A protein has these predicted regions:
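N-terminal, positively charged/glycine-rich alpha-helical extensions of SAM-dependent methyltransferases
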Residues: 1-20, 166
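C-terminal alpha-helical "lid/dimerization" subdomain adjacent to the S-adenosyl-L-methionine
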Residues: 8, 148-203, 213
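Conserved alpha-helix/loop element of class I SAM-dependent methyltransferases that forms part
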Residues: 30-49, 65
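Class I SAM-dependent methyltransferase SAM/SAH-binding core
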Residues: 51-105
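A short acidic, Gly/Pro-enriched loop at the edge of an enzyme's catalytic core
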Residues: 104-115
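A short SAM/SAH-binding and catalytic strip from SAM-dependent methyltransferases
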Residues: 114-128
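A short glycine-rich, Lys/Arg-flanked "PGG" loop and its adjoining helix->strand segment in the class I
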Residues: 129-144
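Core SAM-dependent methyltransferase catalytic element
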Residues: 208-231
Length: 231
């Protein structure tokens, strides 16, 4: 498949699973995804009245956390390429600004935000490095990047157990909860072949982010990565 075709198929897949997406996330993470998103929002270091961008926002679960931190006087934008996801987000949280767009070509001026975040969306981009570069472009100097993402299975017993979960359990559970086993098989494959923590940090640094740090969560299967817009 060509990259363009690939992107269209991924978009169609997220449109299909949108109605059951939040429920599936909760079930598949054993309820931990909510606390991960709270930690990600805290790491964005936002202040009341600030401006936050959530890239690949889905139905807006992290976006809402950002909104709580900037308050009524701030600006919160959620961007996604799935119109179905955005329809659900807009219906649930109409006070937030929802934008359909491409994470690798953000429709915002330079230095528009105090922080940019993305939760479990970076690995679905056709060009993750360009996505991080674009996030750097739209964040003001001194602002923050926060990436919440699954990592390639680590070594040892935990890694083997995690790999079995990805290959065998996740597609079946996803099919049961969201009604689309093929979609969750794709998501399982993207995790199994994704970067490790060191590679993720290197990618962020190469995209213009400084002071990059990674906090492993859930026995090293999830990364909370942060960076600062320097230079």
């Amino acid at each position: 498949m060509t990259p363009a075709r690939d992107a269209l198929q991924v978009k169609a897949m997220f449109d299909r699973i949108a109605p059951g997406y939040d429920r599936a996330n909760t079930v598949l993470s054993f309820g931990m995804d909510r606390s991960w998103r709270r930690r990600a929002a805290d790491a964005a270091a936002l202040r009341p009245g600030g401006a936050a961008l959530d890239v690949a926002c889905g139905t807006g679960q992290l976006t809402l956390q950002l909104k709580d931190r900037v308050g009524a006087g701030g600006r919160t934008v959620g961007l996604d390429f799935s119109q179905r996801m955005l329809d659900l987000a807009r219906a649930a949280h109409p006070v937030i600004e929802w934008v359909e767009g491409d994470a690798t070509n953000l429709p915002f001026e330079d230095s528009s935000f105090d922080a940019a975040t993305t939760a479990f969306g970076l690995r679905n981009l056709a060009d993750p490095e360009m996505g991080l570069t674009e996030m750097r472009r739209v964040v003001r100097r001194g602002g923050h990047l926060v990436v919440l993402e699954f990592l390639r299975p680590p070594g040892g017993l935990v890694g083997r157990a995690y790999e079995l979960y990805l290959r065998l359990a996740l597609p079946r559970l996803g099919g049961w909860v969201a009604g689309d086993r093929d979609a969750y098989r794709y998501l399982s494959d993207t995790v199994d072949t994704y970067m490790n923590g060191a590679q993720l940090l290197e990618l962020a640094a190469g995209s213009g982010w400084g002071d990059t740090r990674l906090v492993p969560l859930n026995l090293g299967t999830v990364a909370l990565m942060s960076g600062v817009a320097t230079g």
